[in-house]
Every structure is written in structure tokens, then in C-alpha cells.
Swiss-Prot record:
It is a multi-pass membrane protein. This is UPF0316 protein CBO0591/CLC_0646. It comes from the Bacteria. The chain crosses the membrane at residues 1-21, 36-56. Keywords: Cell membrane, Membrane, Transmembrane, Transmembrane helix. It is found in: Cell membrane.
Length: 170
């Protein structure tokens, strides 16, 4: 009986983790991969759900194990998605005019594509650096910015599509 509970628990974790990854893939425009994962996901769901529901009155622990698997699956799906880092992002950096030029140079030396535009702050002129990159490079780019000893305001946005650009083609 313990192995049956373990099966329900781990199968539900796998199903929900796949659901999380499928959702991310589809929202990022990866329809084919999302659909393939969806097929596997729903196959697992049908098997596990039908086996839990078939004897739930006689063995209500199945329901608890199923719910625990669901909870852990959500967590695991998020962890896996963070590791895969599928997709693209935009990093906007606002800094002083002189620091902006220096930071753009530092980033370009790290093979990061940077667009620099003039911006106007409350007190002084600023530079805004716009960076489009793969999500896998997020931490590396932010570490480079923070390690440059330049006072900068950084914002990061997930994006779905970028046409053209430097260093982000599939």
C-alpha cells in the first residue's frame, strides 16, 4: 500500500511540474513543445486521477497524498522552470550620463548587446541602457552591472518575442 501512495505522490509531482513547464512554453510561443508536454501531462493526469477516485471512499488517504503531490509539483515545476530559463527578457538600466557610457562598454566587453538612449531625470541628464537577452543570462548580466561600482536603477521584464537584435537569436 505504501508503494501505491508513493506512486500517486510522485506521479502527481511529475504531472503538475509538466503542467507548469507546458504553460510557460505556450506563453512564450513554443506551441509544439508545449503541446507534446501537454499530451504526456494529460496521460499521467488521467491515470492517476482515475486510480485515486476509484477507491477514495475506502481509502481517503489517497486524496491527501494526491493533494500533497499537487503541492510539491507546483514547487518543483517552478524550480525546473527557473533552471531552464526559457525565453527572453529586457533589462532597463538607468544611470548617470557618464556612468552609462562606461557601463555600456563593460557590458559590450561581456558580449551583451546594449542600446543606449538619453533620458532625463529630476535633477540631471541620465542614460538608459536597454538590454534584450536570453533569460539564461539574467544573473550574469545583473552581476556584471552590480559589480561595476556604478550606481544604477535596474528593472527586468520578461518578454515574449524580439525580432532581430544582437546575440539572442534561437
Amino acid at each position: 500500500m505504501l508503494s501505491y501512495y508513493a506512486f500517486i505522490f510522485f506521479a502527481k509531482i511529475m504531472e503538475v511540474a509538466l503542467m507548469t513547464i507546458r504553460t510557460v512554453l505556450i506563453t512564450r510561443g513554443e506551441k509544439l513543445y508545449g503541446s507534446i508536454i501537454g499530451f504526456i501531462e494529460v496521460t499521467i493526469w488521467l491515470y492517476v486521477t482515475s486510480s485515486v477516485l476509484s477507491g477514495i471512499k475506502d481509502d481517503p488517504i489517497r486524496m491527501v497524498v494526491y493533494a500533497l503531490g499537487f503541492t510539491c509539483g507546483n514547487y518543483m515545476g517552478c524550480v525546473i522552470e527557473e533552471k531552464l530559463a526559457i525565453g527572453l527578457l529586457t533589462i532597463n538600466v538607468i544611470t548617470s550620463e557618464s556612468d552609462g557610457k562606461r557601463l555600456a562598454e563593460i557590458l559590450r566587453d561581456e558580449n551583451v548587446g546594449v542600446t543606449m538612449v538619453d533620458a532625463e531625470g529630476k535633477i540631471e541628464q541620465k542614460k538608459m541602457l536597454i538590454i534584450h537577452a536570453k533569460r539564461k543570462r539574467r544573473e550574469e548580466i545583473i552581476r556584471t552591472i552590480e559589480g561595476s561600482d556604478i550606481n544604477a536603477m535596474i528593472s527586468v521584464n520578461d518578454i515574449k518575442t524580439v525580432y532581430g537584435g544582437y546575440g539572442i537569436r534561437k
